[in-house]
């Protein structure tokens, strides 16, 4: 019976001996954890996020202006039945994607998340392209969020210059993220709590209004049979709402990035992921059902819903219908919270992604440095500068800003594609290398149907972003809409040609479990 060393670079006193027979009996993930501490390097992020933080971040990432504002246009476009069907389909897709991400993140809870998984399980070129694309997306989205915050603030203080509010929000979220990851987690926890309470109150008020207990006339389900309802515009309209619904769920993948700083990822990630399905059902499907019951799809207010006119947010309209005073002001405060939360999450996600890219050798080593509190401050400063410059272009050069936003428009969907592909490869490699699925700490649902269905729906959403532009051969609109795709391809091809990478054979895929980012020189 041969004896082998299990670790490299470990002192004789700390080395472990395990027989080959015993090694075969150990679960693959336990082996790496025997010397996990020995592999840790200086300047790592800190694992200070608790289960409640991850659960609320997963929830908060799927509740925002997409629900509070854009849900009205979904009902107006496809009718109550079409709107519900589109959100159910997108919710199912997101659930499968999150269970796929959860399986990988529980096995390897690192800040690089799906970009790192693409590198390990598919092709380093894919991880490189996804990482930089995702970082750029959130850096630009940061500018969008602080601009939206200024629009929301004009509801109360229309005479104050908008840039003051934008700069104020940027400074606040920078300071929050610069403190500790726990400060970020606590901030997100309470902002998500505000959104959750708002939706719960809305559902209660909405149900009471439907039955006529509040707001006078009982609407019941009459709006589902009103004129052309429940399905309006047929399949094209439903496909159009897929796009709206898809954007509404953007950000749910953040839970994968927070896994890198979770104190107990084996416990926190499965719990957060398992709650996604019920939360999507409760907060999205039921909320849209309530709106559809109370407000007919023909209402012009639904089509015009946007952050600049909170008075016609579907949530505001329902609260006003129930006779609640100051509904618009309250919803404006909630939407402001959502915008700040999105900006806060964007700052966090982009700084961690840039940090991870540096660790992997795909970004300057300068950005892999962290403070004594585990904050990748240099990466955060770089992200803030890019976001601030993008914001300045929104004022000084609107056309440039439009193209910057277009360049990041589909990045979230591309990330979702990467999650589905990476998980499919991970599971196949896991089995190919002789492991039993039961060894995994968390199992994705309905594999391989789940990730394949998510992949197909995601491609459908990307393709359907602007079908009208193709019909009318509007090449400028096509370029603006789909600019993210060629940019992603350029990054992918550049890395592939420079480093001559290939699709990693299944029997060579590294499926080992680790909780630390591995430096690649």
Where in the sequence are the language-model features?
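C-terminal membrane-solvent junction of multi-pass transporters and transport-like membrane proteins
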Residues: 190-191, 366-377, 416-480, 502, ...
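Membrane-interface loop-to-helix entry segments
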Residues: 163-221, 250, 273-277, 281, ...
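TM-loop-TM module centered on a large, flexible mid-protein loop between adjacent transmembrane helices
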Residues: 116, 123, 155, 241, ...
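Membrane-helix boundary/coupling elements in multi-pass transport proteins
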Residues: 110, 133-147, 246-262, 325-365, ...
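Extracellular loop-to-transmembrane helix junctions
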Residues: 45-46, 51, 70-166, 173-175, ...
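Membrane-interface "cap" regions at the ends of multi-pass membrane proteins
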Residues: 3-72, 76-81, 94-99, 111, ...
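Helix-loop-helix junctions that connect adjacent transmembrane segments
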Residues: 40-45, 84, 157, 161, ...
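Helix-loop-helix connectors at the membrane interface of multi-pass transporters/channels
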Residues: 115-125, 146-166, 198, 258-267, ...
């Amino acid at each position: 019976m041969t004896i082998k060393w299990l670790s490299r670079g470990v002192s004789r006193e700390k080395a472990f001996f395990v027989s080959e027979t015993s090694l075969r009996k150990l679960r693959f993930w336990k082996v790496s954890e025997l010397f996990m501490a020995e592999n840790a390097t200086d300047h790592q992020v800190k694992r200070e996020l608790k289960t409640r933080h991850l659960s609320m971040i997963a929830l908060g990432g799927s509740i925002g202006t997409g629900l509070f504002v854009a849900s009205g246009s979904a009902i107006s476009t496809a009718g109550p039945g079409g709107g519900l069907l589109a959100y159910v389909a997108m919710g199912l897709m997101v659930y499968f994607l999150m269970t796929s991400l959860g399986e990988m993140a529980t096995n390897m809870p690192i800040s690089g998340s799906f970009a790192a998984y693409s590198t390990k399980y598919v092709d380093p070129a894919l991880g490189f392209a996804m990482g930089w694309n995702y970082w750029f997306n959130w850096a630009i989205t940061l500018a969008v969020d602080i601009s939206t915050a200024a629009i929301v603030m004009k509801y109360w203080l229309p005479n104050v210059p908008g840039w003051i509010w934008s700069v104020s929000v940027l400074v606040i979220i920078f300071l929050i993220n610069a403190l500790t990851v726990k400060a970020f987690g606590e901030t997100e926890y309470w902002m998500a709590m505000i959104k959750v309470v708002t939706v719960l109150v809305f559902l209660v008020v909405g149900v009471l209004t439907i039955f006529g207990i509040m707001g006078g006339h009982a609407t019941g389900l009459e709006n589902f049979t009103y004129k052309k309802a429940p399905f309006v515009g047929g399949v094209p309209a439903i496909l159009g709402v897929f796009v709206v619904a898809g954007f509404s769920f953007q950000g749910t993948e953040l839970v994968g990035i927070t896994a890198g700083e979770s104190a107990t990822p084996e416990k926190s990630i499965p719990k957060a992921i398992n709650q996604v399905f019920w939360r999507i059902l409760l907060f999205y499907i039921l909320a849209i059902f309530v709106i559809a019951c109370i407000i007919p799809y023909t209402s012009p207010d639904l089509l015009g819903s946007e952050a600049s006119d909170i008075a016609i947010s579907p949530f505001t309209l329902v609260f006003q219908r129930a006779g609640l005073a100051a509904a618009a002001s309250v919803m404006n405060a909630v939407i402001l919270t959502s915008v700040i939360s999105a900006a806060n999450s964007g700052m966090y996600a982009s700084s961690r992604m840039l940090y991870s890219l540096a660790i992997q050798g795909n970004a300057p080593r300068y950005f892999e440095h962290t403070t004594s509190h585990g904050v990748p401050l240099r990466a955060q400063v770089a992200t803030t500068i890019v976001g601030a410059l993008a914001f300045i272009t929104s004022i000084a050069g609107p056309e440039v800003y439009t193209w910057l936003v277009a360049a990041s428009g589909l990045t979230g969907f591309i990330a979702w594609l990467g999650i589905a592909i990476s998980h499919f490869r991970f599971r196949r490699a896991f089995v190919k290398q002789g492991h039993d699925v039961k060894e995994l700490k968390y199992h994705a649902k309905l594999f391989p149907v789940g990730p394949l269905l998510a992949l197909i729906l995601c491609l459908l959403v990307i393709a359907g972003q602007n079908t009208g532009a193709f019909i009318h051969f509007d090449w400028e609109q096509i370029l603006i809409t789909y600019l993210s795709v060629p940019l992603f391809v350029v990054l992918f091809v550049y890395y592939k040609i420079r480093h001559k990478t290939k699709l990693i054979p299944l029997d060579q895929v590294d499926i080992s479990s680790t909780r630390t980012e591995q430096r690649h020189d």
